[in-house]
Amino acid sequence: MIARALCAAALAATLLLPVVVVHAGEETGVARVSQGYAGSASCRECHEKFYQLWSTSFHGLAMQPYTAALAKERLTPQQTDLAIGKLKYRADLSKGVVTEAGPNGTKAYKIEHALGGKNVYYFLTPFPKGRLQTLPIAYDVKAKQWFDTAASGIRHFPGTDGSRPVSWRDPEYTFNTGCYSCHVSQLTMHYDLTTDTYKTQWAEPGINCETCHGPSAEHNRAMRAAAKGTVPRDLRIIRTKDFTAEQHNASCAVCHAKMAPLTPTFTPGDRFFDHFDLVTLEDPDFYPDGRDLGENYTYTAWRMSPCVKAGELHCVQCHTSSGRYRFREEKDANNACLPCHKARVENAAAHTRHKAGSPGSKCIACHMPMTSFARMNRSDHSMLPPTPATTIAYKSPNACNLCHTDKDAAWADQTVRAWHPRDYQAPVLARAALIDAARKRDWSRLPAMLDYLASKERDEVFATSLIRMMPASGDPRIAPAL
């Protein structure tokens, strides 16, 4: 979603005119899919425990039909209209519609699907030509508030002002071309260029078992044909237990990366970069130091993590296959880091300089601080230590001030420098300065950029970012680096 400007909320009088109900009749939705896929229900016969864990998870419920039961369990009625420009919007949960009232009357848009649910529910309505469009109001699960979908997506890039949101009718908010691939399973877009229509279809809403394990029909047949008490040598299914760390990470990154697809099909176990082009710091949705500003998901920061670079860490060590965090209990908070950082975990107070058992003594408080964008929480998966010096330079967030909100970045910078005489912030500041210069087309720093690319200590994300931006310099010295 691309921010274009800041919304001016002007109230308009609601006219008591007849309600027009907006429909779209094209064939977009659930369809039977063959090609060896049998559906998640077929897994339940032998894997009831995992089926229950999956079906109640945010993976299994990544998208679901809007129902009265969902509304009763997860949503609270909207008490006041939301004004967006000259229009007013309200969700009528009992009727399953969002009404739009304005100078030309009132329209009602059917709520057909609910998207998400961990932090936010977005809602989809049928639009002409087979499109599913994100409705203009969404629901904050934790705050129990309704809010303006598009206004929440404004980036507020440093040094800019006057931003305004994209209209909710914009193609940026069309499900068929945006968020479809990670909220339903076995999807085909079925776009007809000549008629500009979609017949987008999927096997199941949510992320199903076969998304990670591949088609299961052959597996089901093999298991049913096996003699009682025996297991076939060839299970005819993808066994993620046999994956390397890189294969695990690649399989998760398909949905947890900001990227551009290069091929139409990814099979779990494939190499990520054979199928996708990862967005790096050429995108202003990142601060120059690599911290998140806008919507970036996880994988770019993950590739910057020293823990990941060591080669053994993968997503399923901290998260279950259904997406749950394994260390949510307070007593287990630091166990995620225990296998590799035993000495520090066992004496966390000395390492963190925070009282044992306090929020600041958790590893993730400093190394994976949580920020939010568009009301969606995300933890920093770079796992880098706090760098308040980059906050001073580039306004990026730092873990110290996310907790110590009564202090400023200068205080945090002085504190970490007093605690750590070795200036670990210097390399981060140096490479962030190169990204900042490249973004500003300040090619006086080109020699330093080339030196960084030649360094054995370079970070692949920062190096890739520079390589992508340097051609704008037009300088022939960049040729060897490219």
Can you describe what each PLM-predicted range is?
Residues 1-5:
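Positively charged n-region of N-terminal signal peptides that target proteins for export
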Residues 7-18:
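Bacterial N-terminal signal peptides
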Residues 19-27:
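Signal peptide processing junction and immediate N-terminal pro/mature segment
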Residues 30-34, 41, 49-116, 120-128, ...:
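Primarily the internal scaffold of c-type cytochrome electron-transfer domains
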Residues 178-183:
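Long, basic N-terminal domains or extensions that often function
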Residues 461-464, 480:
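Alpha-solenoid HEAT/ARM repeat scaffold
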